A protein has these predicted regions:
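Short, charged N-terminal beta->alpha structural module
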Residues: 1-30
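Secondary-structure transition/capping residues
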Residues: 25, 29-32, 174-178
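A short beta-strand-loop structural module common to alpha/beta enzyme folds
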Residues: 27-49, 72-75
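FMN-binding flavodoxin-like domain, especially the glycine-rich phosphate-binding loop
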Residues: 45, 51-181
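Generic detector of short, locally flexible boundary/turn motifs and exposed helical patches
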Residues: 8-15, 35-39, 62-66, 142
């Protein structure tokens, strides 16, 4: 039975989603840094973590202490086909169910080195513009570049729907998880 939502958030977007989900599922949400003080080892949880350079932050540590039933990860990129498969590959997720949500950028909350990494990401995404002009970048990539340069949020409650659908199917199999939706 899933008992809690554990999350790691750097600038607040993952935390915001965790709070939304906590309300919808009537489950407590807890920052990963407090999981050991708050929960017994081995309980079943949903893990939510922001993506930093393709890696889901805090996941490995949480996996050592808790039993993770599903992972929700929050990033800035617009997902392309194969995106989830790549996340599986980079994070050794085996057969864990993984869901991706778009968060946002708050430049004022980032360290200098984090800004540098993001600037490089933006430069790479915007590279085709140098060769072929503005028409050569997709709208989705343009939005990401713009968010990286000026901050932006993609957080909305509807983004949780795919996960909620999965969660409901799980609770039909296991009636002890009773979501309050
Ligand atoms: C240093 C750095 C690296 C990042 N790498 C990725 C990445 O590889 N893929 C992605 O989709 N988003 C990436 N992002 C974007 C964050 O995952 C995104 O801003 C997310 O919403 C942050 O969530 P938080 O506010 O909970 O920390 C990166 C952000 C930073 C600062």
């Amino acid at each position: 039975m899933i008992e809690a939502i554990i999350y790691e958030s750097n600038t607040g977007f993952t935390e915001k989603y965790a709070q939304m989900l906590s309300k919808k599922l009537n489950l407590p949400s807890c920052p990963a840094g407090k999981m050991k003080k708050t929960f017994s080892p081995g309980i079943e949880v949903i893990y939510m973590g922001w993506i930093c350079d393709k890696r889901i932050r805090g996941l490995e540590k949480a996996q050592k202490y808790l039993r993770i039933e599903a992972v929700i990860t929050v990033g800035i990129l617009s997902p392309t086909p194969g995106f989830i498969a790549l996340l599986h590959q980079y994070n050794d997720l085996m057969d864990l169910p993984v869901f991706y949500l778009r968060g946002g950028i708050r430049r004022e909350k980032l360290s200098i080195s984090q800004k540098l990494i993001l600037n490089l990401m933006a430069k790479k995404l915007a590279a085709p513009v140098k060769r072929g002009g503005l028409d050569s970048i997709s709208n989705a990539d343009y939005q990401v570049v713009d968010s990286i340069l000026h901050s932006n949020s993609f957080v909305k409650e509807q983004n949780l729907e795919e996960f909620l659908f999965w969660y409901r199917t799980q609770t039909e199999v296991n009636p002890y998880n009773k979501p309050v939706i």
